[in-house]
């Protein structure tokens, strides 16, 4: 925790002078036949050099701007030396919905978005150069996508994540994606993170997840931790006072980014310099100065 606080200190001390750029981009999804907006935060050190990428997913009712509204991502990207990508996930839970062909966000986050980013930014285009995390619905989505696409992501996290959806069958429009739990119990079982994690083996993914004691998702996160312990799967599980809110998530993100930074340092190829990586397809560049 002390090191996380140091990251916060140095990041926000540099916020006024942060040179990271934020691009707003439109990414074409072939599977959904539409464009999906996203924010791309490129640290100053990323100009002309390949860098790892953190995909950062929002929660239910949020959008691609949620994380930037919670905390300024530019100094964090600069301090941790990684590109940060925040896609819009609507209220999809980041599944490929078996009921709604217009909601195929697992394919988007796992395949279409990384391919688009790799083609336009100077990334490290392999699982060793990609991590994914998110808050609430996005925490579920990050673990869901990473568990099912370990060839695409080497590290994953969740903060206040809905890692077991089954205790909440009437909440957050999940019925629109999966149908009623009582009519589709096997579908709900198959679409929850804690069940997906049951086959995970130690070393297949670097994992970090956290939850506040006062969060309604605390128990399901504790259950996931205990399951992984029984399976012998190494992971970082952090708990501390806090509820399901922006104050908790803004404090959690630096800790998770430190975890990913360390993992990238051990696993990603050295970031070599290349020609300038101009971002094609950018339709609006934002200046998020505060």
Indicate residue ranges for each PLM-predicted region.
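Non-catalytic cap/lid and distal C-terminal segments of serine-dependent acyl enzymes
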Residues: 19-290
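Sec-dependent N-terminal signal peptides
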Residues: 4-13
């Amino acid at each position: 925790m002390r090191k996380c606080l140091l990251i916060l200190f140095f990041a926000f001390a540099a916020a006024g002078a942060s040179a990271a750029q934020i691009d707003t981009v439109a990414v074409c999804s072939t599977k959904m036949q539409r464009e999906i907006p996203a924010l791309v935060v490129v640290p100053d050190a990323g100009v002309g050099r390949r860098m790892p990428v953190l995909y950062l997913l929002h929660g239910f009712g949020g959008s691609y701007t949620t994380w930037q509204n919670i905390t300024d991502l530019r100094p964090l990207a600069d301090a941790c030396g990684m590109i940060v990508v925040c896609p819009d996930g609507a209220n999809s839970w980041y599944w490929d919905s078996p009921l709604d062909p217009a909601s195929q966000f697992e394919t988007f986050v796992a395949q279409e978005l990384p391919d688009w980013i790799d083609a336009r930014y100077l990334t490290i285009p392999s699982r060793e150069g990609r991590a994914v995390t998110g808050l609430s619905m996005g925490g579920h989505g990050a673990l869901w996508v990473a568990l099912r696409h370990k060839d695409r992501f080497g590290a994953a996290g969740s903060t206040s994540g809905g890692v077991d959806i089954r205790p909440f069958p009437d909440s957050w429009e999940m019925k629109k994606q999966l149908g009623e739990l009582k009519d589709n119990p096997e579908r709900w079982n198959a679409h929850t993170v804690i069940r997906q994690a049951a086959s995970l083996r130690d070393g297949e993914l670097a994992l970090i997840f956290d939850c506040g004691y006062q969060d309604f998702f605390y128990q399901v996160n504790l259950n996931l931790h205990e399951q992984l312990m029984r399976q012998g799967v190494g992971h970082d599980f952090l708990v501390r006072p806090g509820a399901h809110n922006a104050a908790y998530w803004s404090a959690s993100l630096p800790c998770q980014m430190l975890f990913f930074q360390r993992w990238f340092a051990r696993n990603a190829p050295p970031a070599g310099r290349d020609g300038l990586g101009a971002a094609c397809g950018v339709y609006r560049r934002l200046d998020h100065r505060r």
